[in-house]
Structures are given as C-alpha cells and as structure tokens.
Amino acid sequence: MELVQMATKERIYPVGRFDRNTRGLLLLTNDGEIDKKLTHPQDDVRKLYHASLERKFALKDLQTLSSGDFSVEGKKVFIDDVAYVQGESKSEVGIEIHSGRNRIVRKIFATLGYKVVKLDRVIFAGMTKKNIQRGHWRHLTDQEVNNLKML
C-alpha cells in the first residue's frame, strides 16, 4: 500500500488478496460494490495466472485439468483454460479460472503433485498488467471503471 499512498486521498484497499509468493495484477478500489462484484464466487470473474512449476507439467495432467471435471478438497473447481506458456519450458503453465478460493491455483497443482515456485496473475476481470512494470501502478480509465461496474 506504500506504493500507492500518494495516488489518492480516498481510502483504497485491495480487491482480493495475494499470498506472500504471488505477484502480478492487483486492483485497488474505494468502491465496495466493485470489490464485491470482483470477489464474490457467484460472479464468475475470470483470472489468468502464469504458474512456474518445480518440474515439467505432464501432458496427461494438462488434459486432466482441461477435462472440466476437477475437484480440490472435495469442491469442484472451474478451470476455463490451461495450456503450456508459448515459448517457455513445459514447467511454465497458463491457467484461467473463475474460482475465488484462497490459494486455489497452488492447490490445483498440489492436488496433481506439483509445487508452484512462482505465481503471477496476468489478467483479472478483463484487466491486464501489460505495459505496467513490476512495482508500478496506474489509474484506471473511466471506460475501464465502467466495464468493471457492468460485470
């Protein structure tokens, strides 16, 4: 929060949360309705993560996640897409989900016997971190705010 303390006089807070070893796109807001829309499990907000695994991700496990029938801790997880990251080793996996459970991406891979060594949220609710360097931020445009409100 120190990074954005001079961005506004409003009280802002993160939408959702990251664990200590996760990085990437984090939205901050002063709007409780947007926060609720983006974090409530029933609202199906999609998130795309780049997961770096400790070893190669087997094709059979990729197919298991792609099947659409996958559970973690007895609860169904909705995986929209999963693929190897283009141009990277087979230990680099992109996974798109719309489940908001705590540490769910790490748990998905752990269920299959993989450890996530780095996790980066690349897209959240249609917003991308493209062209924003790590440790930097920007204000949303009016259009982006309206798009979030319409989700």
Question: For each of these PLM feature ranges, what is it?
Answer:
Residues M1-L151:
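Basic, flexible Lys/Arg- and Gly-enriched helix-loop patches that mediate nucleic-acid binding at interfaces
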